[in-house]
């Protein structure tokens, strides 16, 4: 985590240095925004988590004996922030002087984790889940197909702030039946971002901070998992049955090269 923090700090420092190093009066690439259509690519760092909702009733050992130790109640406490990165393609269509529409398909690589706690009614204490893993991870390899509107302010020498608003659909190729939580493949999402175009003689660099919120409940219930011949032992079902809803959440620091 410390190495990641240092990496992010270094990248932010580099961007700030590039902004400061821009000539005070000379305007680089003055006709960059006059193109009707242009292309580029993006590289990003992702901070991944879930919106977690527990099951309506506290989960105990049910009549099928599928939920762990008898007399124990399981809680899905929190979603830990996971790390990832992304690569993407940019197609930008200029509509007006200040408004563009952008098609930015991309692929993300990362993991999300959930922390579980158990309450033993016999011992009357809260403790970590008595299992092999009380922080199971869910691999995430989504391919995004988003569409954005980008509104830009007036250009000031070699800087031009902007905001983006849009959404799209995501198909998760990391969905694996070998995980104790089976995530649904498709999700719809809303995304908002803020950034700044930095103009250089031959290209634009646009650092952008984005927030994404998934709409769908991506949790696959155990009943559906069984239909898909879920290979996990029944003792691990409590990971899913302690939950009622999971939604994808993500904050990204993206560097757009155009």
Question: In which residue ranges do the predicted regions lie?
Answer:
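Flexible, solvent-exposed loop segments that connect beta-strands
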Residues: 53-78, 111-138, 174-183, 219-243
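Bacterial Sec-dependent N-terminal signal peptides
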Residues: 1-31, 255-258
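Conserved binding-pocket/active-site segment within a compact domain
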Residues: 171-176, 184-188, 196-197
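Short glycine/proline- and aromatic-enriched beta-strand/turn motifs that initiate or cap beta-hairpins
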Residues: 26-84, 250, 256-258
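Gram-negative (and chloroplast) outer-membrane scaffold detector with strong preference
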Residues: 27-38, 45-49, 90-175, 254, ...
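Predominantly the C-terminal beta-signal and adjacent terminal strand-loop region
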Residues: 185-187, 201-258
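Residues that define the transmembrane beta-barrel architecture of outer-membrane proteins
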Residues: 35-37, 81-85, 139-143, 159, ...
């Amino acid at each position: 985590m410390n190495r990641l923090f240092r990496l992010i700090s270094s990248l932010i420092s580099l961007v700030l240095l590039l902004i400061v190093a821009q000539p005070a009066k000379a305007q680089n690439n003055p006709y960059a925004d006059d193109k009707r259509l242009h292309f580029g690519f993006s590289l990003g760092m992702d901070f991944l988590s879930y919106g977690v909702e527990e099951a309506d009733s506290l989960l105990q050992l049910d009549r099928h004996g599928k939920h762990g130790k008898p007399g124990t109640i399981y809680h899905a406490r929190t979603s830990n922030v996971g790390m990832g990165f992304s690569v993407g393609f940019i197609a930008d269509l200029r509509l007006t002087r200040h408004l563009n529409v952008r098609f930015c398909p991309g692929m993300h690589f990362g993991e999300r984790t959930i922390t579980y706690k158990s309450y033993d009614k016999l011992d009357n204490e809260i403790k970590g889940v008595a299992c092999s893993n009380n922080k199971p991870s869910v691999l995430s390899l989504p391919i995004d197909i988003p569409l954005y509107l980008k509104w830009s302010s007036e250009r000031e020498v070699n800087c031009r702030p902007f905001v983006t608003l849009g959404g799209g659909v995501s198909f998760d190729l990391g969905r694996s039946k070998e995980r104790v939580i089976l995530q649904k493949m498709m999700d719809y999402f809303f995304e908002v971002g803020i950034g700044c175009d930095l103009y250089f003689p031959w290209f634009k660099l646009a650092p952008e901070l984005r927030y994404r919120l998934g709409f769908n409940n991506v949790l696959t219930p155990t009943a559906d998992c069984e239909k898909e011949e879920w290979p996990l032992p029944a003792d691990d079902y409590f990971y899913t049955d302690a939950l009622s809803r999971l939604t994808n959440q993500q904050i990204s620091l993206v560097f757009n090269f155009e």
